[in-house]
A protein has these predicted regions:
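Outer-membrane pore/translocation modules
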Residues: 1-61, 103-105
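Outer membrane beta-barrel transmembrane domains
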Residues: 62-153
């Protein structure tokens, strides 16, 4: 289990269409589970919620969100795991502006694509994944390429 706290940092100007920061806090509890077999099935899932607060400059509060990241792969026995992964995203509650619901604006997206992971056997690993979004509603759609390195302390 994990608890992330996102704080409003970065530049924000309500008159700009795009901003670096979101200008509101979000509390994000999550549950993570993994099954690792160097010579077989590997499975990872992270299920999390984003409990969003109000942007004080605009009076806008994005609805609460469910995020599920997943990966399913096969260990080749030499540290490499090949497979697929992606995400499921669903906004669960309406956005609100100055306390009033903004109906019909709930976001949704799904993504899937290939994953490649190398596990060093010494605690650190690196993952590359390509995700193509589909069935997107009320948010931008695209393809993302991620490289993630995990190093234990």
């Amino acid at each position: 289990a994990a608890l992330d706290l996102v704080v409003p940092v970065g530049g924000y100007d309500a008159s700009r269409a795009a901003n670096i920061g979101r200008n509101y806090a979000s509390i994000q509890p999550a549950y993570l589970v993994s099954w690792i077999d160097p010579n077989g099935l590997n499975a990872d899932a992270k299920v999390g919620m984003s409990l969003n607060r109000t942007n004080k400059d605009t009076g806008y509060r994005s609805g609460n969100e469910l995020n599920i990241d997943y990966a399913l792969g096969w260990g080749l026995g030499n540290g490499w795991v090949v497979g697929v992964g992606g995400h499921l995203y669903q906004q669960l509650s309406d956005d609100r502006r100055n306390g009033q619901a903004v109906p019909g604006n709930k976001g949704r997206s799904y993504a899937a694509g290939p994953n490649l992971k190398y596990d060093s056997g010494k605690g650190w690993f690196i993952t590359a994944k390509l995700n193509k979004e589909f069935s997107v509603r009320s948010r931008s759609e695209g393809t993302s390429f991620w490289i993630k390195t995990t190093i234990p302390f």
